[in-house]
């Protein structure tokens, strides 16, 4: 049996020792306007999701689990939420199930960022990964790790629903090339503007690995 952890789920994406982003994952929900039913609001939200190249693959499907979740909160698909009233459709923060992504990198404390880097650095030979954390606040003094993924889904940081985007592929490719060029002392090197910063970050990371 697993212990229940109070808080919200965050994915920390680390590539070659660089913390690219911290993304909060939130369950699917709709926001009322005082006119449309939950079912109609889901259809409206799905049209919005189609405008995103990533989210359009994952519409909010009205499943039996969503109906059961609404029923457990004394609601149904026919309920008309008040203006600005937010209604959760599930307790699961899964993008495939209609969840959303918020880039909270700039809001999270440096201690949490260092914690994520230290956790990944504690695994020998692992320089890139996706850490699933549970936080109670943006400056939680005791964050919890619930999962470590050796193959991070970098698209999560590229296409957040809210907040600034990032370019994880650029970070990964350029940091690998910078490392390769310094290790092999190549004459005709590919110019990377942030090469020194990539190498410095990786060396700091490796000291803890």
Residue ranges and their predicted role:
Residues 1-7, 20-22, 27-52, 56:
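Conserved ATP-binding module of the ATP-grasp superfamily
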Residues 3, 14-16, 135-137:
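Short, low-complexity Ser/Thr-rich regulatory SLiMs
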Residues 7-9, 128:
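Short beta-strand-initiation
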Residues 10, 21-22, 31, 140, ...:
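Intrinsically disordered, low-complexity acidic/polar segments
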Residues 11-25, 34, 69, 73-78, ...:
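Beta-strand scaffold of nucleotide-dependent catalytic cores
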Residues 35-41, 48-62, 163-172, 180-188:
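Low-complexity, flexible helical/coil segments
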Residues 45-139, 195-203:
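A long amphipathic alpha-helix within ATP-dependent nucleotide-binding catalytic cores
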Residues 100-110, 122, 126, 135-209:
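C-terminal active-site "lid" helix and adjoining low-complexity regulatory extension at the edge
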